Amino acid sequence: MTHQLHAYHMVKPSPWPLTGALSAFLLTSGLIMWFHFYSTALLTLGLLTNVLTMYQWWRDIIRESTYQGHHTTPVQKSLRYGMTLFIISEVFFFAGFFWAFYHSSLAPTPRLGCHWPPTGITPLNPLEVPLLNTSVLLASGVTITWAHHSLMNGNRKQTIQALLITILLGTYFTLVQISEYFEAPFTISDGIYGSTFFVATGFHGLHVIIGSTFLLICLIRQLFYHFTPSHHFGFEAAAWYWHFVDVIWLFLYISIYWWGS
């Protein structure tokens, strides 16, 4: 048995970043195949690879943090820095979509009819379904904060209740967003308006699904007594991510749904 004289976790070689990158490649390629050729084989393979990667990577992290005790205080501090940098990178990722939207909408070209929305586009009413979804996400932000405070106070029952409500709200948001896509009077192929609308809101919807999955894992871990008031970075990271998703949606709602209409 080896002994270490420092508090840092020396991570062993892991195949999951490689399989995660492979699954991302398969998913993007599969989406292209689905859009252009209506073939779902590559997309299904990408989804399967992604699910297997997530399961095994989460399994390893839970083993290292909960059962082997590798997530010491210095390690948790480094993980917080890493999560902060990841969220900052996501901010720049979405900044590109907002840039594309405002670049096109603030100075519309003659091809767009010199006005925004472009000629022939009927935008969605921001005071109907989009406002409902905004209320749902804001409510989920309240419930995830409730879950965090309950966990910090050692109230296991309320933590489980609040997490479950947050997951249900996230699922409801996703279902409403899907129904909105089906009922929208324009498509992703309807010029720059359709492209920016569906790509920006679609990637946000993907982040909601990822965040809901993250919170579902936290709920399962809470049921198995993995979290304590002083050791729950997995939950903390999920909560940060969920608040980030909330804030991005507010900017999307104000920019694309309200001002853009």
Swiss-Prot record:
Positions on the Mitochondrial intermembrane side per record topology: 35-40, 106-128, 184-190, 257-261
Transmembrane segments: 16-34, 41-66, 73-105, 129-152, 156-183, 191-223, 233-256
GO cellular component, one term: mitochondrial inner membrane
SUPFAM superfamilies per record: Cytochrome c oxidase subunit III-like
GO BP field: mitochondrial electron transport, cytochrome c to oxygen; respiratory chain complex IV assembly
Keywords for this protein: Membrane, Mitochondrion, Mitochondrion inner membrane, Translocase, Transmembrane, Transmembrane helix
Topology Mitochondrial matrix: residue spans: 1-15, 67-72, 153-155, 224-232
Classification via InterPro entries: Cyt_c/ubiquinol_Oxase_su3, Cyt_c_oxase_su3_dom, Cyt_c_oxidase-like_su3, Cyt_c_oxidase_su3-like_sf, Cyt_c_oxidase_su3_a-hlx
Annotated compartments: Mitochondrion inner membrane
Reaction equation(s) it catalyzes: 4 Fe(II)-[cytochrome c] + O2 + 8 H(+)(in) = 4 Fe(III)-[cytochrome c] + 2 H2O + 4 H(+)(out)
Membrane topology, from the record: Multi-pass membrane protein
Chief place of localization: mitochondrion
CDD domains: Cyt_c_Oxidase_III (cd01665)
E.C. designation(s): 7.1.1.9
GO molecular function: cytochrome-c oxidase activity
Complexes and interactors: Component of the cytochrome c oxidase (complex IV, CIV), a multisubunit enzyme composed of 14 subunits. The complex is composed of a catalytic core of 3 subunits MT-CO1, MT-CO2 and MT-CO3, encoded in the mitochondrial DNA, and 11 supernumerary subunits COX4I, COX5A, COX5B, COX6A, COX6B, COX6C, COX7A, COX7B, COX7C, COX8 and NDUFA4, which are encoded in the nuclear genome.
Function summary: Component of the cytochrome c oxidase, the last enzyme in the mitochondrial electron transport chain which drives oxidative phosphorylation. The respiratory chain contains 3 multisubunit complexes succinate dehydrogenase (complex II, CII), ubiquinol-cytochrome c oxidoreductase (cytochrome b-c1 complex, complex III, CIII) and cytochrome c oxidase (complex IV, CIV), that cooperate to transfer electrons derived from NADH and succinate to molecular oxygen, creating an electrochemical gradient over the inner membrane that drives transmembrane transport and the ATP synthase.
Family: Belongs to the cytochrome c oxidase subunit 3 family.
Name the UniProt record assigns to this protein: Cytochrome c oxidase subunit 3
